[in-house]
Amino acid sequence: MREKIRLVSSAKTGHFYTTTKNKRLHPEKIEIKKFDPVVRKHVVYKEAKIK
């Protein structure tokens, strides 16, 4: 089953994206480069739990 996750910016701006992932096939945490509109740069986003 796909679970909702939150991708939090490593630039400490508080910006985040939400997405889903299949935890059975990919149990490791996601790290992906995406655009952060607050600092207007591409930064690494790391997986975090949705509260």
UniProtKB/Swiss-Prot annotation:
A Gene Ontology biological process term: translation
Which keywords, in A-to-Z order, does the entry hold?
Answer: Ribonucleoprotein, Ribosomal protein
Per its UniProt record, what Pfam families does this chain match?
A: Ribosomal_L33
A single GO cellular-component term on record = cytosolic large ribosomal subunit
Give me the disulphide-bonded residues.
Answer: none
Query: GO MF terms on file?
Result: structural constituent of ribosome
Signal peptide interval? none
**Keyword Ubl conjugation set for record:** no
Homology family: Belongs to the bacterial ribosomal protein bL33 family.
Q: What is this protein called?
A: Large ribosomal subunit protein bL33
